[in-house]
Each structure stands twice: as C-alpha cells, then as structure tokens.
Design a protein with these regions (language model features):
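Helix-to-beta-strand junctions that scaffold the AdoMet/dcAdoMet cofactor pocket
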Residues: 116-117, 130-131
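A structural alpha-helix within SAM-dependent methyltransferase catalytic domains
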Residues: 50-53, 123-127
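Conserved phosphate-coordination/catalytic loops
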Residues: 15-19, 117, 192
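Short catalytic micro-motifs in class I SAM-dependent methyltransferases
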Residues: 111-115
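S-adenosyl-L-methionine-dependent methyltransferase catalytic module, highlighting the catalytic core
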Residues: 120-125, 135-244
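Short glycine-/acidic-enriched loop or helix-start segments at secondary-structure transitions
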Residues: 50, 72, 118-119, 147-149
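A generic structural signal for alpha->beta connector loops
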Residues: 57, 85-87, 133, 206-209
C-alpha cells in the first residue's frame, strides 16, 4: 500500500505528545518493565506506542475509535519508524470489539479516561485483556469540575464557567453558534465524572489500586491547587488530574 504524506497538523500533535511523555512517565515514578507486551487504550496519534517500542517493549498494540488518528499513526509508523513495524500495530476499533482472547502485561492510557463515557464498562474490557498480575497505567485530566474541565469545548470564557451554566444552556448555545445538533455534554466527548466518582469506579472495578496521586505535577499552579484541595469543600474544584496504577489480582492473591 502506498504511503500518504503525513498531515502536518497531526504530525505536530504527535511530536508534542512525544515531548510530553517524559513528564507522563515521571509522574508514575518511571516506566514499567519494558520487556513486556503493552496495550494502549485511546492511543491517538501513536506517540506513546512508539515511545514504548523504542524503549524495548516486545509488543505494542494501540487502539482508538478515531479512524483518522489511526490512519496517521500507521502512516507515521511506516514512514518514520519502519524498524518498529514488527513490534507496533494500530487498530481503529472500540476496545470492546478488539480481540478479547489476547492478554497483555500492561495496559496504558494517557489523557483518555475523562473522555470515556462508560468508564466502568471500559475498565471491565481492560480487565479481560490484562494478564493476572498485570497493571493498568492511567494518567488523565483535567477532570470535569476543574477550572477548565470542559476542555474549552463549551465556549465558557471564565474558569469554571461551564459549572455556572446549565447543560441545557450550554447545549442550546453550542447548537445555535456552531450549527451542530448535540443533545448532551457527553456528545462533546466529556464524561463529567467527579473525583469521588472516579475513586468509586476504581474501587468497584475488581482491580487493586496500587498507586493513586491527585494533581501530579511540578507546576506551581498545581502545587497551589493541592493546598486548596485539602479543604473538603474545595477538593472537587481543584482536582486537576489523576495518575493511577491498577493491578489485576492473581488467582493465588
């Protein structure tokens, strides 16, 4: 198949994502054992998959529901990383429809959990594809109740502005201004989950939470947020990101 020229905006997004990966892994305390198999859920343009393969992973599969992103990831792999073609593969598919007989040592997910509408169902699908003792590395944010938790998709001008308006008002104005037809905030790719709800989902998932950190960053603003988040009535509104590691229990645990 003839390779297409890479879209410049997508390539720029990929390159930015690659630069951010050092911070991503640092927030977990470093990369996991790389002589292993990995599944990247919500792989986007494939930066994390390429990083894992370059670092020594035995096998890396990236899945994403956006066909254009997967198209870019495949072309980028063929053009710029041909030496990794036997290690990395990309699939434009919902995880629920990906081969559930294959299990991985690790599942990774970067900046995706806040966009997954039915997160409990997604975690259940992850469990099926995780080896006993395997780990899920997930880092994501901003959370919906954060100052820009709407990912600037609601056209709110001020911080926390999306929380001061009803969903109905937001939807009505977006439909009128952008000539679209959405019926809920979910249509913007935002699950609206709170910090408490994320914790409950992880607790009920059947996976063991072995690492959990809120506002995991050295940025001065997030350090300040951490101080404010210590006050129970402010916690939800200053919960910017979550970095967690979830473990699938072994039979003899």
């Amino acid at each position: 198949m003839e390779e297409e020229e890479l879209d410049k905006s997508a390539l720029k997004y990929f390159e930015h994502g690659a630069v951010e990966l050092e911070k991503f892994w640092k927030r977990f305390g470093g990369k996991p054992n790389l002589n292993a198999s990995f599944l990247d859920v919500g792989c986007g343009h494939g930066a994390l998959c390429i990083d894992l393969a370059k670092s020594g992973a035995k096998k890396v599969i990236g899945v994403d529901i956006e066909p254009e992103r997967i198209k870019f990831a495949r072309n980028n792999l063929n053009i710029n990383y041909p030496e990794l073609k036997n290690i990395v593969d990309f699939h434009a598919v919902d995880l629920a429809y990906y081969n559930n007989s294959e299990q991985f040592d690790y599942i990774v997910s970067k900046d995706s959990f806040e966009h997954i509408i039915d997160l409990p169902a997604m975690i259940e699908e992850m469990k099926k594809r995780l080896k006993p003792g395997g780990l899920v590395y997930a880092g994501f944010g901003p959370l919906y109740r954060d100052f820009y938790g709407d990912h600037k998709r609601t056209n709110s001008i001020i911080p926390w502005g999306h929380l001061f308006r009803s969903d109905e008002n937001i939807i009505k104005k977006l439909n009128r201004k952008n000539d679209v037809n959405i019926s809920s905030i979910y249509d913007l790719g935002l699950n609206k989950l709170s910090l408490v709800e994320y914790k409950e989902i992880f607790e009920k998932s059947g996976l063991e939470t072995v690492f959990f950190k809120l506002n995991n960053s050295n940025h001065p603003i997030l350090k300040f947020f951490n101080l404010l988040a210590k006050f129970p009535f402010l916690t939800e509104y200053f919960a910017h990101n979550i970095y967690c590691i979830l473990r699938k229990k072994c039979v003899d645990d």
